[in-house]
């Protein structure tokens, strides 16, 4: 039996049950869809899901997770392609508070609703940050700190048998995210660095964060 024959048979039976109904194949008020598998499934509404691939089918990667808007979205997007993620957060007390750390823990839990369980590594970055501040040119502080973060993240990634790093960087969004700056941070890594939101503008990232439910947590006023 063909799909056209199924349509004709089911359509006829529906019209028998509802004689006041009529068929309009061009502008229908209601479209009924039918899937025949082990059983017959009839439905009138299709709800779009996240799509993507089963978690873990494309290996594992390490997400550099902050309390901002971008990195949770990056983690979600790479997880949607079947990549299992772990995460690393750089905490710098007393310059960042315990509430800031809790915000990142909460974000990891929110992303984990889509990605499956996330192992979160919390790194005390204060001593390294102060050393860089004392010893390095101040106009290069951000890039140098970022290079240290990438090295540390790669250490945890290799321990966890991850196949790459994930960041929420987007070209030109801030001064430290020019192509030259991204190349400078890449230089310290031997693993590939994946940047799922690299071509997004800020509004596009914000919209995606609303969709996945991380936006309200990300904008909580705790420095990360």
Please report, for each region that a protein language model flagged, where it lies by residue.
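RNA-binding accessory domains that recognize and position tRNA/RNA substrates
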Residues: 1-62, 72-119, 126-127, 187
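Active-site adenylate/phosphate-handling loop in enzymes that bind or generate adenylated species
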Residues: 9-18, 46-58, 129, 135-207, ...
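Conserved G/P- and acidic residue-centered "switch" motifs that form tight phosphate/ATP-binding loops
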Residues: 68
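Residue-level detector of anion-binding/catalytic polar loops
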Residues: 84, 163, 215
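Short hydrophobic alpha-helical runs that function as membrane-insertion/retention elements
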Residues: 86-88, 195, 218
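Small/polar glycine-rich anion-binding or flexible loop at a beta-alpha turn
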Residues: 171-173, 221-224
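A short alpha-helix-loop-beta-strand transition element characteristic
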Residues: 213-221
């Amino acid at each position: 039996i063909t799909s056209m024959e199924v349509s004709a048979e089911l359509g006829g039976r529906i019209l028998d049950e509802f004689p006041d109904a009529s068929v309009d194949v061009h502008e229908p008020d209601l479209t009924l869809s039918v899937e025949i598998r082990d059983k017959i499934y009839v439905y009138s509404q299709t709800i779009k899901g996240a799509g993507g691939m089963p978690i873990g089918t494309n290996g594992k990667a390490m997400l550099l997770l902050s309390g901002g808007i971008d990195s949770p979205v990056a983690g979600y997007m790479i997880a949607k392609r079947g990549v299992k993620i772990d995460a690393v957060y750089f905490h710098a007390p007393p310059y960042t508070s315990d509430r800031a750390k809790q915000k990142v823990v909460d974000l990891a839990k929110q992303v984990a609703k889509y990605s499956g369980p996330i192992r979160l590594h919390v790194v005390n970055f204060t001593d390294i940050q102060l050393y860089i501040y004392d010893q390095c040119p101040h106009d290069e502080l951000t890039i140098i700190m970022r290079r240290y973060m990438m090295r540390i993240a790669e250490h945890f990634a290799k321990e966890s048998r991850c196949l790459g790093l994930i960041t929420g960087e987007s070209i030109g969004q801030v001064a430290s995210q020019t192509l030259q700056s991204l190349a400078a941070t890449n230089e310290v890594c031997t693993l590939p660095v994946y940047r799922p939101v690299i071509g997004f503008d800020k509004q596009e990232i914000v919209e995606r964060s609303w969709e996945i439910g991380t936006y309200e947590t990300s904008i909580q006023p705790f420095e990360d």
